[in-house]
Amino acid sequence: MAPALVSEALSRLGLHQAYALVADHALRRAGQDRLSFFSLDLHRDAASRVKVYVSHDDAGVRSALLAAAAVPSANPDLVRAFCALLGEGISVFGGRPLISSYTFTEANAAAPATYSLYLPIRAFVPDDQTARDRVRALLDRHGIDRSVFDRALAEVSDRELRDGVGLIPHVALRTGTVRPGITVYLSAEAYSTTPARARFDQLAHA
């Protein structure tokens, strides 16, 4: 059902080749690659965005590289380094999926303008101190001032970072012709904090 709906939606928006491109590059593993989200800007001009998200269960870097190859201007070296820095020592990202996102515009209907890769870092670290250190290393590699990230993290929570995991749930890499960069997502932990040791034990016995 979802593939047909997404294909039809893209066609109605004038992006007639978009679904085939997404399927060829990101929906390659039956039962493991799946459409997750579909979004669009609610205004009409040539720069209005249509975005398609694909989740990759139990995926390695190769799946991300194949997905990124749909965008001619995407940098595969950035994708490799992103996965290596945040998923230190991990060859298969299990438990929580990697997520690919494609941004299409009417002005560039033949191919996506950008490719984004979302990595659920909380699933692959023992605690938020480790997550913070890996994010800092990533920001340094991209020449981004880490002080903004540090201030935001301090404002969101005053607990010891080594005492929990999940304060930094996802990190995203955006590569392509439109505003390449890094996005770091923070959680308010409004209901509870996942204990660091509990999370580590779950990973060890997964």
Positions of PLM-derived features:
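Extended, well-ordered protein cores
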Residues: 1-15, 19-51, 55-57, 70
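C-terminal structured domains
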Residues: 49-206
